[in-house]
Amino acid sequence: MTLLQIDFPSHGPWGEELTKMASALAHHLNNTPGMVWKIWTENSRSGDCGGVYLFTDESSANDFLKEHLPRLDSMGIKDVRAKVLDVNESLSHITRAPIAAPVAKTA
């Protein structure tokens, strides 16, 4: 399992407004090969937005990143920080991490 962390500075939208704006993208991301899930993150107080993604393998995470960074750039999103990290599954199971979920599928 591989974790991808992405964050970037943002002036919004936040909350429900972001949900309305990004809903189509969220549904599109469900078709991402190897993606198990994505947690959407935002902090209007600090002006940060992004997500945490779980992938079945590092290759899938890197392939997604190659596709997603240009998409973010086309949306005017700059200064994107991204990290690809291995998941320690043994320790993560002890702390109840949701890493045994099936790969995301479109409804």
Residue ranges and their predicted role:
Residues M1-D48, E58-K66, K78-A107:
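Short S/T/G/P-rich N-terminal loop/turn motif that feeds into the first structured element of a domain
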Residues R71-G76:
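Short arginine-rich
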